[in-house]
Amino acid sequence: MMDCDHLLRLGMTAKKILENGKGILAADETPKTLGRRFEKLGITNTEENRRKFREILFSTKGIERYIGGVILNQETFEQTSGSGVPLTELLKKKGIEIGIKLDKGLIDYKEKEKISVGLEDLDLRCKSSAFKDATFAKWRSLFYFYDGIPSEDCINENCSILAKYAIICQKNGLVPIVEPEVFLEGDYSMKRSYEVTRQILSTLMKYLNYELVYIPGVLIKASYVTSGQLSNEKYTPKKVATFTLRALLSTIPCGIPGIVFLSGGHGSEDAIGFLNAINMERGCRTWSLSFSFARALTDGVLETWRGDDSNIEEAQKILLETSFKACRGAEGKLWDQE
C-alpha cells in the first residue's frame, strides 16, 4: 500500500511535467529506429552520432520553457556530453523531468495483432540504479485496424499489461505514461477510429482501476481520432478535435491529470494543428491536453543538422521554434500573436 506522501509526489510530478502548457519530448527511439531516420539523411548510425544528436536536443537554450519532460532510451542514461557531463544532467539542470521507456517492444498475438512485453523483470528495472534520475516512465501498446481487428481479446490483454506496468511503476515512485497507440496505417474511417478508441480507452480505465493504480498519478498518451492513411476520407483539424475530445470525455475520468498526444505518423504542422484545435474546443474537462512528440519535434532538427556540427545552432533554433508552437497549441493559442 502506497502512503499519502508517496501518492502526493506522484500526483505533483505528473502535474509538473505539463504545467504552463509544457509537453513532452519523446527521445526514446531505439538505436535501430533512430538509425533508420539517420540513413534517410546520409548520417552514419554510430553511438557517437546518436549521442551527439541527443546532446543537440537537450542542450538547446530555453527548451525548458516548452518541454516539461523528456522520455529517454536506456542507451541515453549511459551517455555524456562532449564535455563529459551526463546527458541526464543537462536535463536536470534545466528542471526537466526525466522519463524512461520500459516496454521491450511487441510480439505477435493471434492473427495480425501485437501485444507489448517486458513485465517479467519490470520491477527490477524500475529499481535499477542506472535509471535513478528518472521520475516517470512510458509503455507503449499498439493496435492495428483491419476487419474485426483489434479483437476484444487483444484490447483486454494490452490494457491489462499497461495497467500492471503502471502499478509497478507507481510502487517504485515513477509516474507511468500509458500509451495505447492506434496505428495510423490502414483504410479505416474516422467513425470506426472513434468507436474503437472509445473501446480501448474505456477498457484501459477499467484495468487501471482493477490494478488499484493511483489515477491522479498517471498520464495517458493517446492517438488523435482520424481516418487511416489509406482512407480517402478527408478531415479538418476541427473535425479531428470534435471526434477526439468526444472520445476522451466519454471515457477519461476527471482524476487523470493530463493526456498527451503522440504525433503517430502525422507531420509536425498537422500534429500541432490538431492539438491547437482540440484545446480550442469547449468542453467540461479537468485534465490538461498537451503533446508527447518525437518526429513532430525533431524531424526538422535532424534535417537541418545532417551530421554537420556547423549546423547545430540552426538545428537548435528549429527545435525551439517547433516546441514553442507545440506549447501554444497546448494552450489553444497557436494563432494568437499577442
Swiss-Prot record:
Biological or metabolic pathway of the protein: Carbohydrate degradation; glycolysis; D-glyceraldehyde 3-phosphate and glycerone phosphate from D-glucose: step 4/4
Residue positions binding substrate: 50, 138
GO molecular function: fructose-bisphosphate aldolase activity
Superkingdom to which the source organism belongs: Eukaryota
EC number: 4.1.2.13
One example of a Gene Ontology biological process annotation: glycolytic process
Keywords carried by this UniProt record: Glycolysis, Lyase, Schiff base
Protein name per Swiss-Prot or TrEMBL: Fructose-bisphosphate aldolase
